[in-house]
Every structure is written in C-alpha cells, then in structure tokens.
Amino acid sequence: LGQDWVEDTASFGTVTIGCARLQACVHHLERSFAERPLRKTAQSGNFLVAVPEGAQHTLGAVVLAAQLRQAGAVVKLVLDASAEHMSKRVKSEQFQAVLISASIGQNIESLRQFVQASRDRENQSNVIVGGSLLSVQSDLNARVGADAATNKWQEAIKLGLRGLPCRQVAL
C-alpha cells in the first residue's frame, strides 16, 4: 500500500480506505491478544503515544500502541492532539515516556512546540520521537528537543523505561 502510494499507482482514496482497514485489523488483533497471556518477557511501563494535530498519518502510531500493549505496557493513544491538550495531559497523568509520531512534511517548529508541551513539569517523562520524518531528519531529536528518536518499538520501551537526560533544543 505504501509502495503503491510512493510510486503513484494508488489513489488517495484507495490508500485512505486501505489504511482504515489496516487499523481495523490492528484493533481486531488487539482484542484477540487480550484473551491470551502476555509474552513471558513482558515489559512494564506507562506510555503515551501521540499524533500531533493535523497529521494525516496515524497507522504507525496505532500499530506502535498495539505492539507496546502486547509487550505488557500500559498505553494511552491520542490522535490529532494539540500542544495544549498534551500539556494538560502530562500534567494530569504520569507517563514514563511520551512517544510522538512525526511524519514527513510535518513542520519542525510546530513539532518542537509539541515536544515542549509534552514534557511534564518535572521533566520526568522521556519524550521520544519516531515516524517517517526520521528517514529524512537524522538529527530530529536534537532539532525538536526530544530525548531520543527511534522507529523501533523495542528500543522505545528501553529508552522510555530508563532515565534519559533532557536535551536542550539545538537552534
């Protein structure tokens, strides 16, 4: 589906419907996972997975949330979240990590503001960015002020569960 989009052999409608169906499949699989015990190597942790307001790409975040849950983590997923919503959310709930989806085409400055709003007052939550934007921005975490950047869910768990020093935004 993604390759067809890149090669311009699939219409916007086809890709949108295909992604919606894939998300429905993920939700169906999550229900069946809930009926089975977690893996023996289950990870604990409390994560917030967020897709910034206006982003059109949500499938990766939905899949990430499902993978984290299957690994034993407690996960909250917010789609189309504003910076204001994130600021309120991290002040009212404690998360070990906030995982932010960053898509190609996303404005770096607005993403930096979103990352900043996603920090709790005490900077105890690690803020980790991932997504397609990493393929074109190797220094993304430094540019937006995140603690780390990865597209590997296993690495996100490890980074989220250990204390990372908060980095200053590189201007």
Model-derived segments and spans:
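Short, charged N-terminal beta->alpha structural module
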Residues: 52-69
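Conserved hydrophobic helix-helix packing surfaces used for dimerization/oligomerization
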Residues: 46-47, 98
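Cofactor-cradling patches in redox/metallo enzymes
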Residues: 67, 76-78, 82-140
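Short, flexible hinge/linker loops that cap or flank conserved catalytic cores
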Residues: 40-43, 121
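Long amphipathic alpha-helical segments
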Residues: 1-35
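Long amphipathic alpha-helical segments with strong coiled-coil/leucine-zipper propensity
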Residues: 33-37, 49, 56-57
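Peripheral docking tails and interdomain loops at the edges
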Residues: 133-135, 139-171
